[in-house]
């Protein structure tokens, strides 16, 4: 196994032992669960970035696009989508909000890919531009503020995001989501040319 041959694995073990001796709370169950939860979030993004790196590219805009679609998801939960022409505000349920944000993120990624492939712009430059556009749009969306309460309201049917942060059997749901995404990505890499 390559992991055991590399120095990085042993450095990781040394760091865990060092911080475990420095603070016994570091090796507590709650601390380890918190670390695993955060690693899983970055792992999900890392799975997607793996495909970009395999093709020899780079995508600097990922974090900004995640921030933008997160800001839009928060806005859809807290404020809904005002339709001024009809004088109504539309509220979406969580699956619809997830679908909207995935489609928007995919669309922005498609724009990156189109600029890179059709116009022969270097991936670094194209994604740097998209990073600044996504950051700017996120700032414009809320004037630099954040959404602090995205629990939604039962009456509007937009609750459920808090389930993504919950646990199943003591393990955060996002960890299961990471392993599912990683497994699908692995199968795609293994069985497609």
What spans do the regions from the language model cover?
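Alpha-helical transmembrane segments of multi-pass integral membrane proteins
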Residues: 3-4, 37-38, 97-104, 173
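Single transmembrane alpha-helix segments in multi-pass membrane proteins
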Residues: 6, 17-22, 27-81, 114-124
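Alpha-helical transmembrane segments within multi-pass membrane transporters and channels
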Residues: 81-130
